Amino acid sequence: MAELTPEDIRSFSYLADIGGTEKAFSIPLIYHFLIRFLSPLVRFFFNINYSGLERIPRKGAMIVTSNHVSNLDPIFKILAVRRQVFYLAKEDHFKKQPNRFIMKSNGMIETLRSEGGRDALSRAHDVLSSGFALGIFPEGTRSRNKKPPFLQNGKTGVARLAASFPDIPIVPICIIGSREVMPPGANFIRFWKAIDIHIGVPVTFGEWLVSNDGGDFSK
């Protein structure tokens, strides 16, 4: 596999056209307590099965991606990663209390779609620059597709962030079963359902660029 030169990396970072706000990103204190409280609670109410946990980096910046079919998906991803994950979230989640308080106190990043989400991507840049884990759903919202594998077309945000940080690992996660627990439009949670969470092999944007199964820029 060919390797990218420093000049190549700078070129792709420039083309991604994402810059941070130059403000350091810190972990809200309440987030530490929430994860400790939430983990045993969720494990009590759901039968969660994990595979590939050893593939998740225990420290350093990374981008965590997955499919998105339920409002509970971010929680399941955080429990799988076993460290704080900061998400991009649509502005609707910030409009009313107590949702706004919960989102802000856990470092979630409000995405203003009227502005194309640029401010949110800049803060996401800050998360990665600070060495933290960024959670993002490539589809941009919960999928309403009713046919397996319940996917819809993705957005460009995750690709632009990955191009801005070609050496940061992207961890793919597949969540199976959360749609049965709380599908889009549902107001109630169905407890004691089985949730399967599969963690794939991490890959960096730089590795993808020169891979035969990716960008194949090595030729």
Place the predicted regions along the sequence by residue.
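Hydrophobic/aromatic ligand-binding patch that stacks against planar heteroaromatic rings
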Residues: 77, 102, 126, 158-164
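Residue-level preference for the first positions of well-ordered beta-strands
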Residues: 61-63, 133-135, 169-171
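A transmembrane-helix-recognition feature enriched in membrane-embedded lipid enzymes
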Residues: 2-55, 76, 83, 97-106
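Catalytic-site beta-strand/loop segments enriched in glycine and acidic/polar residues
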Residues: 127-159
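Helix-adjacent hinge/juxtasegments
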Residues: 109-123, 128-129
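A conditional alpha-helix N-cap/helix-loop micro-motif detector
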Residues: 46, 114-118, 151-152
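A cross-family acyltransferase "interaction/gating" segment
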Residues: 148-215
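Catalytic core of membrane glycerolipid acyltransferases/transacylases, capturing the structured
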Residues: 58-116
